[in-house]
């Protein structure tokens, strides 16, 4: 018996919406990354993008375990001398773009190549309870 290999014409993608209220960041991110890759499907093929489209709402209401909300620090560099910048998870969540916390966590769990960037494009994270993807008729996905 030959191994199954998914073709682009046979891949079926569904739309799911997840309410992130009171969900732990890492546990939510690992489940979403698995679904973006398509590893929950029996037709999973490692070199094909066979995952689903995910919409996450209420991204500002996620929670961290322990004291990570104050201790976790995100770093980046401006590429100028002395340009190391940082922000804590608490400031990021209470700032203008709280959805970036979830995006960074999920992006770190995807492959670091062209396929991973293609998978990441199927993720839509919003800070409120509204999203503009009602035309796709997403299914509610309960995690945990």
Curated annotation (Swiss-Prot):
It holds the Pfam family Ribosomal_L13. Part of the 50S ribosomal subunit. InterPro entries: Ribosomal_uL13, Ribosomal_uL13_bac-type, Ribosomal_uL13_CS, Ribosomal_uL13_sf. One of its GO terms (cellular component) is cytosolic large ribosomal subunit. Keywords: Ribonucleoprotein, Ribosomal protein. GO terms for molecular function: mRNA binding; structural constituent of ribosome. This is Large ribosomal subunit protein uL13. Transmembrane segments: none annotated. It comes from Magnetococcus marinus (strain ATCC BAA-1437 / JCM 17883 / MC-1). GO terms for biological process: negative regulation of translation; translation. The keyword Ribosomal protein applies. This protein is one of the early assembly proteins of the 50S ribosomal subunit, although it is not seen to bind rRNA by itself. It is important during the early stages of 50S assembly. Belongs to the universal ribosomal protein uL13 family.
């Amino acid at each position: 018996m030959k191994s199954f290999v998914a073709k682009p014409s046979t891949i079926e993608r569904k739309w799911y919406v997840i309410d992130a209220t009171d969900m732990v960041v890492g546990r939510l991110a690992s489940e979403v990354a698995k679904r973006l890759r398509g590893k929950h499907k029996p037709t999973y093929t490692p070199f094909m993008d066979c995952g689903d489209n995910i919409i996450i709402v209420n991204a500002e209401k996620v929670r961290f375990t322990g004291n990570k909300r104050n201790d976790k620090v995100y770093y980046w560099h401006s590429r100028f001398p002395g340009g190391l910048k940082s922000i804590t998870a608490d400031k990021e969540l209470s700032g203008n773009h709280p959805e970036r916390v979830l995006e960074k966590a999920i992006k770190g769990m995807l492959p670091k190549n062209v396929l991973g960037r293609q998978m990441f494009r199927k993720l839509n994270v919003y800070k409120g309870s509204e999203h503009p993807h009602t035309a796709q008729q997403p299914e509610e996905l309960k995690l945990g």
